[in-house]
A protein has these predicted regions:
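Acidic catalytic/metal-coordinating carboxylates
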Residues: 43, 69-72
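The feature encodes the CheY-like receiver
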Residues: 66
Length: 127
């Protein structure tokens, strides 16, 4: 008999990025992993409105949004009663930004190039 097969439970994810093409790519990656993208947003305001309507379990949030800061949004999402698991993404992630991500309650911060990485999958799925 083979080893133990761990069934991954799909989670509902909100994708927040001002680049529609990136949101589309993220949606393809996440649904390919078996997750359900329950909403997309291009701004902080849209993300907060969407989050209260669809109550996602997790969110993939860009650091740079046109109407605000992804770190502040991450803090607000993580503080919601159902405690959204937030992973921040950035075109130019560095160590200082990664520390800031953890301080606001995010699971971590990854460069956008690592969208399809196992690290992102681990951060989103480990509730």
């Amino acid at each position: 008999m083979g080893g133990c097969h761990h069934e991954r439970v799909p989670c509902s994810v909100l994708v927040v990025d001002d680049d529609a093409a990136f949101r589309q790519l993220a949606t393809r990656v996440l649904t390919g992993w078996g997750h359900v993208v329950v909403g997309e947003a291009g701004t902080v305001a849209e993300a907060l409105e969407c989050a209260t309507q669809v109550r996602p379990q997790a969110a993939l949030v860009d650091v740079g949004l046109p109407d605000g800061d992804g770190f502040a949004l991450a803090e607000r999402l993580a503080a919601l009663p159902w405690a959204v698991r937030v992973v921040l993404i950035s075109a130019d992630a560095d160590c200082a930004a990664a520390r800031s991500a953890e301080q606001v309650g995010a699971r971590g911060l990854l460069p956008k190039e690592q969208l399809s990485s196992q690290e992102l999958r681990r951060l989103l799925e480990n509730g």
